[in-house]
């Protein structure tokens, strides 16, 4: 296969069937898997059409045949209280006969350049290969904790001021509840119609939801779930405070006579076992989302560092396998009130870091002290202490899937 015969260009809506066919081939999505969640092939295409219209999709073509592709969804996320435009990378795939031609590297490079032009200075993705995306500049920023609780281990009922009511899973009440939660949750995606469409896309028809309302009738949390074969499956549970969490678990425990166990996932950094009276439950942790900073100086300009009594500086060199704007020596200045500026400088620097490590550090997933200990940051002790004091301590919450 000769790369000279291939052309890279935007993928229009007329190629939607080819787009989906490529994804189904690469990720081995069968008709049986589609039907298990109530989908038919044509329904998937219709469901994806509105999303494709909003996305930035680029691909390589062999004549009129789409052979490699990436898509970027326009999204917004919260980073320590600051709202950022984010590029959600998805739809990544190449037919095997076109592999080893460097097609995907070029697509990722172009996608990142497009994000930069659109001021999307942070990019999220769900990785099919963590090593591959690490080589391209992404790094882990969140975890998923899966758990299994036997019926006799469910928490006992505790009195709360509010109440739980079942609602339509696709209703506005659920969206309002999530919006209240995401507004103050670090890392959370601020879901618009596109993000909600992706959130529900692969769910079953019989999925259910319930909302916890506080004593002022304000929605302070929800649970999304289904029940099958005497198992209570929790897709997601969010809550703004401990009272809402307790109220939602009261609701789960009320199903005691109907179920043998509860299986679910949580996307916080807090294992569930410690909160239960019978803590001997099954829990497993796995990496979930990755991210990469697209344009470091632009990202830092909006980043909310912690305020301090003094101005702080750090000179360092940074590597990035794709984006030139993130390569070279930098001077990072942090003002007393926590405003950051980063400019390129010409002199060489003793301290060094990669864009991968910078991303996971500034997103709060791993701390500077830990990253220095494992050799991911090369800097003196005073610099590491300064970074520890300057960066908020809270891993991102991401429960989306796209």
Question: What do these predicted regions represent?
Answer:
Residues 1-17, 28-30, 161-402:
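Intrinsically disordered, low-complexity, positively biased terminal segments
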Residues 23, 31-77, 186-209, 299-305:
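Active-site rim helix/loop that mediates acceptor-substrate recognition in acyltransferases
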Residues 57-59, 65-75, 88, 93, ...:
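Conserved beta-strand in the GNAT
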Residues 76-83, 149, 229-236:
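A short, polar/charged loop-to-alpha-helix boundary motif
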Residues 89-113, 242-253:
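Conserved acetyl-CoA-binding loop-helix of GNAT-fold acetyltransferases
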Residues 108, 113-127, 257-267:
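Conserved GNAT acetyl-CoA-binding A-motif
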Residues 117-121, 127-145, 247, 269-285:
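Conserved active-site alpha-helix within GNAT-family acetyltransferase domains
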Residues 147-165:
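Contiguous, non-catalytic segments that form substrate-binding/exosite surfaces or channel walls
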């Amino acid at each position: 296969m000769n790369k000279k015969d291939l052309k890279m260009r935007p993928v229009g809506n007329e190629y939607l069937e080819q787009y989906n066919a490529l994804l189904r081939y690469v990720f081995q999505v069968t008709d049986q898997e589609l039907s298990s969640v109530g989908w038919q092939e044509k329904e998937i295409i219709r469901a994806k059409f509105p999303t494709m219209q909003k996305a930035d999709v680029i691909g390589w073509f062999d004549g009129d045949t789409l052979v490699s592709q990436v898509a970027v969804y326009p999204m917004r996320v919260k980073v320590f209280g600051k709202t950022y435009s984010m590029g959600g990378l998805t739809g990544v795939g190449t037919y095997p006969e076109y592999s080893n031609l460097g097609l995907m590297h070029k697509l990722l490079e172009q996608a990142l350049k497009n994000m930069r032009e659109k001021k999307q200075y942070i990019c999220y993705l769900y990785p099919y290969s963590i090593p591959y995306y690490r080589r391209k500049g992404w790094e882990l920023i969140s975890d998923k904790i899966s758990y299994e609780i036997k019926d006799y281990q469910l928490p006992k009922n505790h009195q709360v001021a509010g109440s739980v009511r079942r609602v339509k899973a696709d209703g506005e009440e659920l969206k309002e509840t999530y919006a209240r939660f995401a507004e103050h949750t670090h890392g959370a995606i601020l879901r618009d119609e596109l993000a909600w469409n992706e959130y529900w896309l692969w769910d079953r028809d019989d999925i259910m939801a319930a909302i916890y309302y506080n004593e002022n009738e304000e929605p302070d949390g929800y649970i999304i779930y289904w029940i099958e074969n005497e198992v209570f499956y929790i897709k997601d549970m969010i809550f703004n405070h401990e009272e809402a969490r307790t109220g939602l678990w009261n609701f789960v425990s009320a199903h005691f006579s109907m179920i043998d166990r509860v299986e679910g996932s949580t996307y916080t950094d807090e294992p569930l076992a410690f909160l239960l009276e019978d803590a001997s439950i099954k829990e497993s942790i796995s990496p979930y989302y990755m991210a990469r900073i697209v344009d470091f100086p632009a990202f830092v300009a909006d980043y909310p560092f912690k305020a301090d009594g003094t101005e702080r500086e750090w000179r360092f060199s940074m590597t990035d396998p794709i984006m030139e704007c993130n390569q070279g020596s930098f001077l990072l200045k942090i003002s007393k009130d926590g405003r950051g500026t980063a400019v390129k400088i010409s002199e060489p620097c003793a301290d060094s870091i990669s864009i991968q490590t910078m991303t996971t550090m500034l997103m709060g997933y791993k701390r500077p002290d830990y990253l220095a200990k494992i050799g991911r940051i090369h800097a003196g002790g005073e610099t590491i202490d300064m970074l520890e004091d300057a960066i908020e301590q809270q891993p991102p919450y991401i429960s989306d899937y796209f």
